[in-house]
Amino acid sequence: MVRPDTFNTFQYLSDRVDAELKVTLEDRSMPLYEMMRYHLGWNNSANATQIARIHGVTCLTANQNSSGDMNMALPVAAAVELVDNFVQIHDDIQAGNMTRNGRDAVWWVWGPAQAINAGDGMHALARLAMFRLRDRGVPVDITFQALRFLDDAALAMCEGRFQDLEAQERIDITVEDYLTIAGMKKGSLLACACKLGALLSGRGEEVIEAFNSFGTKLGIAMQIGEDIRQVWESDNDSTAPHNEVLNKKKLLPIVYSIQTAEVREKRRLGEIFMKRVLEPADITTVRSILNELDARRYSESLAEDYRSQAVNDLTTLSIIHKKDKSIDQLTSILTKSMPI
């Protein structure tokens, strides 16, 4: 069980990232930026919401565990958070999600075309936020290395998302394929957040690479947890329950089942996922087959394996104090809704 003070620390770091994001946008008044503020949860409407800045907090946690100065790392924490939000806006358009964080999605309020502008604008702002490092006295070479980390991660994430979409019409995706895609789609940006935090602490390649591995594996664990919820739990933010299943996304429980099923079940799953359009009734059939194959337990076990591996990647680093539980606490919070 995660102690209450852990959540207070997480919220403190999230608030610091939020403040840095507001500075990034404070001088921009065009309605385009109001769309961004709305997505970030800042507008003054009655349904404004507080949103956890997961990637920014991860960045600051890595920085603190590398004995860094958090104030120096705030620009990169804001930058990686902006990239994540750019992806969220595009995700909602792509999947047809009408809501995000309990209220109307940006595209549902302003239309897809303007939402694309808002998302792309956030990506540009992320790169500009990086240059605030120079205002804090960070050397040019470190600033440009940080920018390279961010661009590499954004590109890897796009590659993973491309492969994820390509897989929708295929039934020959293996678990190994899935893990590669999840590492790129979900793990690359979280790994980037970790690398940026370590980089801004002045640590060398060994520490940066350890945090890179930590972030990638934690991202995979988070993706598996999201997949489990899509199959077995209702998602209040979706346009319909199990939206990813209806969109024929190859979630881990489905990939595992197709790969390991006997011919009869394999054929039945193939018939469903080769349909042009899936119907809600198909989900009941899919879930029944997955339950027969114990796909949930397999997925939960693999998620926990990746979470444990992520933490273990950092235990050999001499800079990580054994009594400092912030890494364990971070992974617990980020995976708290995983059914493990």
Enumerate the language-model features and the residues they cover.
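Inter-helical turn/loop segments and adjacent helix faces that build the functional surface
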Residues: 65-69, 129-147, 164-181, 195-211, ...
